[in-house]
Amino acid sequence: MKIIPLASESLGVRSLALFLRIGKVGILIDPGVALGPKRYSLPPAQAEMKALAVAREKIQEYAKKAQIVTISHYHYDHHTPFFEGLYESSSIEKAKEIYTGKILLIKHPQENINHSQRKRAQEFLKNAREIAREISSADSKTFDFGEFIIEFSPPVPHGREGSKLGYVVMTLVDDGKTRIVHASDSQLINDRAIDWIIEKNPDILIAGGPPTYLSYRVGNVREVGIKNINRIIAETNAKLVIDHHVVRDKNYENFFQELDKTPQTFAEFLGVKSAPLEAYRKELHKLEKGEDVELPKGIQKFLKGLPP
């Protein structure tokens, strides 16, 4: 199994998009990307817009290599919608390129879903039905493709139990040699998600960590996240790749240091330093104005690699 992270906060955008290659088959997991429209009361900086364009191009590139596409839920940083979106770098043409002729394994569009995501799912399916090879609701199901299986969890909360953000499904891919779980936006802060991950005992766990940058609004997610992740560490031998929400916090590395085993971000999995642009949006706006700012080395290097 070849594992290729495509986009995430450590790569400058909101996403947890992943590509897997098993033999001749490509699997594209959560093919969406977005920017937070407001952070520190500021819109995305120019560097973030450039990073968004780079991430979008990468998702489109790997969509061409995929026969199977999975969608854990209907937030725009996890699927590409059929509309022109500035902060999603989306369009009807880009969506068609991703989904045409593909086997789509998707979160159930009507069950265990909140009002917002139900509307988004309906809009998605209205367009996808015309172009996809096949569409199946994935919740709690296992799909056998011969060389590998793809198994989906029951719906789990998007974050804490009772979250108003609805539900997500987690994805297990097993080719007989490697078991990888993509835990999406479970955020590792609800027991249902943790129990399922431990039961599946993956070799690699890819997950969005808790939204510690929102602790003032969502409570003690830091402590809950540390307890739950340490439980996964104690009860499995999984390699941890944790990114997404937690990397929107400037101090995410301090969170990692409190764990019994240090995770990698997507960037680190790829062998480069993390570049959490959103967390440093204030500094990026100052940089645009010609002011002197201090930025982590990972961001400095990332900025040099962006297109002009």
Swiss-Prot record:
Q: Which Gene3D superfamilies match?
A: Ribonuclease Z/Hydroxyacylglutathione hydrolase-like
Q: Which domain of life is it from?
A: Archaea
Sorted alphabetically, which SUPFAM superfamilies does this protein's record hold? Metallo-hydrolase/oxidoreductase
Membrane spanning residue stretches: none
Q: Which family does it belong to?
A: Belongs to the UPF0282 family.
- Name the HAMAP family on file: UPF0282 (MF_01406)
Q: What is this protein called?
A: UPF0282 protein PYRAB09800
